[in-house]
């Protein structure tokens, strides 16, 4: 609200917009032309309209029931169990990429910056849920941060994949803008969370400082395209852009990175403004499309960004949720990057991006369906 109607009442708006009421009265009473009289009526009722438009939207958020809370807690415990059981000294306290149980049982002993960041967040979430104490949080977080500090980097950025048994980068050294951004923004959240528990274990304050040091050392200038005001997809092992393609859509997993880079002053605000906002409509909703139409692109950034109610991003998320619900099979919905029914020579599931065609710019083959 503006200062002119700061008490929020109609009387307050009338008191501070007397000139509008007076001018509207004169125009309505004495103007010879109907158009002027109509303008006078609008001016007369302007304070009332301004008050109604400035009033807060009623919050329709529902409080979770006890049953829902227990269900969420059970899901959280099962998710944390993956990290708890698979992260150890054998993996240098880094999480494996995935665990496959059939048709061949195997563990993918590789990891990425996003995987590492989510593991660190899972430790913090486990403390929030009460699954572990602050001492265990400090011990395990310290072990992982210690390993991260030893990993080979380029200008403070982690490479895209590491062998967690040898800690060496895998394949041709490559630095992904979105993976690097995910990791750094997750560390920002982790540091804030560790501060909340630092009174219970002094080591947590030191670990929060270590997280901020890693964030501070990460150079995102290598991804910046000054002509397009966007981020390159990634860079080679020497920090040079690979190709000319940039992340150019707001409904993308890069949204978190772009928001933080602009908010922290690392890169110009033009970055946020340059992201495409291509609009479409479906099932009574209007919203922005993404490249692949996946849940990951729309909803993953919302783990970290506050969603402003009734904003265009909020409407686009509702649009995406509606599209995902309509793209269901046997009541199950939610399509994103995942494994699918195809195998490599070692009988490992292949992995690629999947999405809802009506939410995507990408074209999908007919009959392809994954949930």
What residue spans do the PLM features occupy?
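Ser/Thr/Asn(+Pro)-rich, low-complexity disordered segments
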Residues: 2-49, 54-371
């Amino acid at each position: 609200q503006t200062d002119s109607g700061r008490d929020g009442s109609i009387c307050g708006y009338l008191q501070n917009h007397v000139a509008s009421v007076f001018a509207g009265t004169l125009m309505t009473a004495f103007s010879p032309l109907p158009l002027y009289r109509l303008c006078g009526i609008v001016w007369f009722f302007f304070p009332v309209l301004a008050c109604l438009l400035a009033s807060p939207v009623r919050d329709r958020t529902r409080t979770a029931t006890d049953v829902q809370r227990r269900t969420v807690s059970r899901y959280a415990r099962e998710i944390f169990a993956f990290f708890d059981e698979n992260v150890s000294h054998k993996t240098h306290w880094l999480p494996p990429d995935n665990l496959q149980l059939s048709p061949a049982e195997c563990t993918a002993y590789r990891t990425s910056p996003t995987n590492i960041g989510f593991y660190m967040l899972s430790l913090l979430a486990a403390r929030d849920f009460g699954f572990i104490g602050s001492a265990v949080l400090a011990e395990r977080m310290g072990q992982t941060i210690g390993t991260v500090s030893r990993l080979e980097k380029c200008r403070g950025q982690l490479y895209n994949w590491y062998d967690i048994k040898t800690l060496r980068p895998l394949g041709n050294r490559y630095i992904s803008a979105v993976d690097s951004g995910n990791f750094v923004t997750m560390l920002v959240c982790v540091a804030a969370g560790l501060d909340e528990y630092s009174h219970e274990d002094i080591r947590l304050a030191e670990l929060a400082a270590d997280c901020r040091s890693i964030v501070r050392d990460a150079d995102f200038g290598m991804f910046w395209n000054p002509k397009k005001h966007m981020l390159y997809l990634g860079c080679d092992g020497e920090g040079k852009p690979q190709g000319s393609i940039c992340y150019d859509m707001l409904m993308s997993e890069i949204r978190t990175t772009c928001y933080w880079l602009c908010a922290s002053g690392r890169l110009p605000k033009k970055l946020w403004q340059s992201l495409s906002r291509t609009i479409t409509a479906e099932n009574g909703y209007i919203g922005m499309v993404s490249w692949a139409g996946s849940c990951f692109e729309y909803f993953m950034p919302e783990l970290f960004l506050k969603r402003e109610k009734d904003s265009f991003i909020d409407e686009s998320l509702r649009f995406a949720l509606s599209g995902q619900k309509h793209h269901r099979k046997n009541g199950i919905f939610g399509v994103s990057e995942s494994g699918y029914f195809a195998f490599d020579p070692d009988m490992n599931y292949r992995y690629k991006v999947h999405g809802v065609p009506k939410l995507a710019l990408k074209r999908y083959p007919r009959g392809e369906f994954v949930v």
